[in-house]
UniProtKB/Swiss-Prot annotation:
SMART domains: Ribosomal_S15. One of its GO terms (biological process) is translation. InterPro entries: Ribosomal_uS15, Ribosomal_uS15_bac-type, uS15_NS1_RNA-bd_sf. This is Small ribosomal subunit protein uS15.
């Protein structure tokens, strides 16, 4: 199931840097993280769903690239984001 409009707006409101911000790296990573967690739960239940697994891997790669970009450009924002999302230990 795709992310609902209400849930997406809730995530955007939490991570937006300014009013109407939907494209900042923080927002994109937060939305991808929610989708990845959702797909991860699906994969645990449906182990043979290879198409969904491939989509999950693509989302993980996209998030990894966005995080690498943020880390290169602004380390403090990167650290705040991974701490707030609970990524990496």
């Amino acid at each position: 199931m795709a992310i609902s409009k209400e849930k997406k707006n809730e995530i955007i409101a939490q991570y937006a840097r300014h009013e109407g911000d939907t494209g900042s790296v923080e927002v994109q990573v937060a939305v991808l993280t929610w989708e990845i967690n959702h797909l991860n739960n699906h994969i645990k239940e449906h182990k043979k769903d290879h198409a969904t697994y491939r989509g999950l891997m693509k989302k993980i790669g996209h998030r990894r690239n966005l995080l690498a970009y943020l880390r290169r450009t602004d380390v403090n924002r990167y650290r705040e984001l991974i701490q707030s999302l609970g990524l990496r230990r």
